[in-house]
Structures are given as C-alpha cells and as structure tokens.
Amino acid sequence: MEVFRIYTNSPLRNFTYILRNSETSETLSIDPYDSEQIEKFLDSKGWTLDFLLNTHEHEDHTSGNTGLVQRYGCTVYSHPEGIGKIPHATHPLKKGDFLLRSSKEYLEILDTPGHTFCHVCLLLVENQKPKAIFTGDTIFNAGVGNCHHGGDPEVLAKTILEQFYPLEEEILLYPGHDYLETNLKFTLSLDPSNQDAIRTLEECSRLSKNVEFLTTDLRKERKINTFFQCDKPSLELRKNVSKKIPFKQLLDNDPTSFFISLRSLRDQW
C-alpha cells in the first residue's frame, strides 16, 4: 500500500492521507480537508480518486468532501452514525469491514468511540501483518483526542485500553493532526525525567517546520505518550498526577481512572 501524508496548513494542523492499493490501483483519501490541495496532488500523479473515508463528523475532517465528490464522483464512507452528518456520506462501515482489499493488503475498520460516537480508525494490513494505523482524532503522537464536542473520556479510555494497548509495537501511527511538540511538552510537564520524550522533542526541533514530520510507531508511543502508560505509569508520572487530581477521582492501580485524570489535566493545560 502506498501511503502519502499531506499537511494541510490548516489552523488545527490537520493531516489528510492518500492511500493507493499497489495491486488494484484503487485510491482512497482519508479525512480530506482541502479538495483543491488533494486534486493538485492527484493530478501530479495522473490518478483519479475512488473513495473517501471520514474518520468522524467534525468539519475539519470533512470539508474537502464536496469538491472531491463533484470532481471524481467518489464513494464516501463513514461510521454508520455519520450518515446524515457527514457531507455526501452514503456507505456505512462497521467494525471488521474492509477497504482497498486485495490479495496482499487491505484496510480493516475499527469502531473507536470516545472523541465522538461515530469515529472509526483504519488498520493497514500487508501480507497478513499489521503495518500502520490511521487514527483520526482518537490518538495523536504523544497524546489523544479531546472529548469536548460529542465525546466521552471514559469511553475514549475504554477504546484505547482495549483496542490499542494490545496492538503490535511495530505498527506506524498516522494521526489526524500534528500536535507532537505540544503533546511532548505536556508529557514532560508531568514526567520531566522522560528521556525518550526529551530526545523526541529535540528531534522535532531539527525538522523543517510545517514541511517535515516525525512518524512514530507504537513502541515509541508507549515511551512518550502518557496515555499509553496508564497501566504502568512511572513513579514520577503517578506522583505528579496525584498531586493535581483529587484522591477520590484517582483510584489506585486503575488504568481507566488514570487515563481520565490525564485527559482532564490535558484539557486544563
């Protein structure tokens, strides 16, 4: 599967993704923000667009739909609850469905509520091995999505603890936004001795701003992303979270409670 990440220069630092099946040449856009930007990319390749998928209903993930449907007549997929909310979405996808499927590669749909209740993520599988995951606003580099606009932090905790914690470490993470530097600073505000976060922040500082972006895998995320450490937080992380969260809200050795506490702290940070 060919994967192309397009930085949109949007106020919320959105990413759009273009995926192309290497066997069938079918092409998909995930979370199109700017239809003209995507058309320009496709024209440069001499490609058309077969499918759109919106991970959820928020406008910054769907604003390119109308222009792309008008140009290419492509099919628009979404979570079943997104039909009627997402422009031009007509084809619902449920957990376990597939897109861009061929003999060697496919995208598997995950039902991932929390940021909103009609959110899906996509797991890229090649030669029967998970290779990458497209997470929309469920998980970011070194962070997770907020729950301010139609979500629930307890549901998000359940989604991430049950569906993402068990995934293989080699899987690459492709989120819906570039929030890495900000999220690393949040990690270090609670866990200032986290050497992996320090090194990753230094790595970010050497990149060309708005041109180059780090791609992390889940192995790195488990080191730099506090939301992936809720089952085994470091002593320093646990101590600093406990200082800021009332005792009655932070239950001992409860990953869900710790996750919700982190999400609350991130909301206020």
From Swiss-Prot:
Residues that coordinate or bind Zn(2+) 2: 60-61, 137, 177
UniProt cross-references to CDD domains, sorted A to Z: hydroxyacylglutathione_hydrolase_MBL-fold
Note accompanying the cofactor annotation: Binds 2 Zn(2+) ions per subunit.
UniProt catalytic activity: an S-(2-hydroxyacyl)glutathione + H2O = a 2-hydroxy carboxylate + glutathione + H(+)
EC category name: hydrolase
Cofactor(s) essential for the protein: Zn(2+)
GO BP terms in the entry: methylglyoxal catabolic process to D-lactate via S-lactoyl-glutathione
UniProt keywords, alphabetically: Hydrolase, Metal-binding, Zinc
Pfam families per record: HAGH_C, Lactamase_B
Binding site for Zn(2+) 1: 56, 58, 115, 137
GO molecular function annotation: hydroxyacylglutathione hydrolase activity; metal ion binding
InterPro entries for the chain: Clx_II_MBL, Glyoxalase_II_hydrolase, HAGH_C, Hydroxyacylglutathione_Hdrlase, Metallo-B-lactamas, RibonucZ/Hydroxyglut_hydro
SMART domains associated with the record: Lactamase_B
Entry EC no(s): 3.1.2.6
Pathway assignment: Secondary metabolite metabolism; methylglyoxal degradation; (R)-lactate from methylglyoxal: step 2/2
Assembly mode: Monomer.
Summary of the function given for this chain in its UniProt record: Thiolesterase that catalyzes the hydrolysis of S-D-lactoyl-glutathione to form glutathione and D-lactic acid.
PANTHER family, A to Z: HYDROXYACYLGLUTATHIONE HYDROLASE, HYDROXYACYLGLUTATHIONE HYDROLASE GLOB
Family: Belongs to the metallo-beta-lactamase superfamily. Glyoxalase II family.
Name this protein carries in UniProt: Hydroxyacylglutathione hydrolase
Source species of the chain: Leptospira borgpetersenii serovar Hardjo-bovis (strain JB197)
